[in-house]
């Protein structure tokens, strides 16, 4: 990223988007940072000493299509145009398929799927007029493979990936690219919220969690190219295994118990650490 650019990000009060906002501002870019929780967003800005001359903080409920229209239009008025839109806001609520409360089904679909669709739609219309632009949507490894214990969440991330790739096929000829980022588990407050949820054991499997720095690298080095890819998988080996299980779902029950055992073990370790820290 040589020249300075104008970015629009969602979910900036915490996690991946909070980290990326700080990095982008540190590189001299302008960021229109949004979150459903404006107070938490303002706290993040103070903690990170985000430069007021290059950042705008606004409340945005990504589930609200009208709010998307209004807030994105304000971003265009503020910066003149938006070069890159990152749909990062998401919601993870693990539960067994038959036990997930209906309100949690709605909330995950509304935030993870509709929020991304509304954001991509608004950003793409603006970018098509300019003949260039890039939309980056955070999907998940759960969009590459079935995830027992997170059936609804996985369904939303399959949807994000499918929508992003389909939209990119439509928009590339108009100079606008859409990239789906599909990471394995990332150490963020959202994942921390599932520490005591047994249904989330698969997301705690493996030898370690990804860091927000690794997502930063995946986006800046692998996604933001002259001709951006349709999707980026992080890390490569684990996501290749995920795709294998997706292509041959009958092998899933063979691998799942081992990964669930690993996840439960890690959850127990983290819970013990949490107790000792109290």
Task: Kindly give the residue locations of the regions a language model identified.
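SDR active-site lid
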Residues: 172-236
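Substrate-binding pocket helix/loop in short-chain dehydrogenase/reductase
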Residues: 96-97, 101-109
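Active-site helix of classical SDR
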Residues: 120, 156
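Canonical Rossmann dinucleotide-binding motif of NAD(H)/NADP(H)-dependent dehydrogenases/reductases
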Residues: 2-32
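Residue(s) in the substrate-gating loop at a strand-loop-helix junction
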Residues: 140
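Conserved glycine-rich Rossmann-like NAD(P)H-binding loop of the short-chain dehydrogenase/reductase
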Residues: 27-43
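The beta1-alpha1 cofactor-binding region of Rossmann-like NAD(H)/NADP(H)-dependent oxidoreductases
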Residues: 59-70, 102
């Amino acid at each position: 990223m040589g020249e300075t650019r104008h970015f629009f990000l969602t979910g900036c009060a915490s996690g991946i988007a909070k980290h990326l906002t700080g990095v982008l501002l540190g590189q001299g870019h302008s960021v229109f940072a949004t979150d459903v929780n404006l107070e938490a967003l303002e706290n993040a800005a103070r903690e990170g000493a985000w430069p007021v001359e290059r950042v705008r903080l606004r409340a945005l409920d990504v589930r609200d299509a009208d709010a998307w229209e209004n807030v994105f239009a304000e971003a265009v008025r503020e910066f003149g145009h938006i070069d890159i839109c990152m749909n990062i806001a998401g919601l993870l609520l693990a539960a067994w398929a038959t036990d997930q409360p209906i309100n949690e089904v709605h909330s995950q679909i509304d935030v993870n799927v509709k929020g991304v669709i509304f954001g991509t739609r608004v950003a793409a219309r603006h970018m098509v007029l300019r003949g260039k632009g890039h939309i980056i949507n955070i999907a998940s490894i759960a969009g590459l493979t079935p995830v027992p214990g997170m059936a609804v969440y996985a369904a939303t991330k399959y949807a994000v990936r499918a929508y992003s790739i389909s939209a990119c096929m439509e928009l590339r000829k108009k100079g606008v690219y859409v990239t789906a980022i599909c990471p394995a588990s990332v150490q963020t407050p959202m994942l921390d919220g599932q520490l005591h949820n047994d249904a989330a054991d698969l997301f705690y499997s493996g030898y370690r969690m990804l860091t927000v720095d690794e997502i930063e690298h995946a986006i800046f080095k692998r996604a933001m190219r002259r001709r951006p890819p349709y999707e980026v998988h992080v890390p490569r080996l684990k996501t290749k295994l995920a795709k294998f299980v997706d292509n041959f779902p009958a092998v899933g029950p063979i691998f799942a118990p081992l990964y669930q055992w690993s996840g439960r073990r890690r959850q127990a370790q983290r819970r013990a650490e949490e107790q000792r820290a109290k």
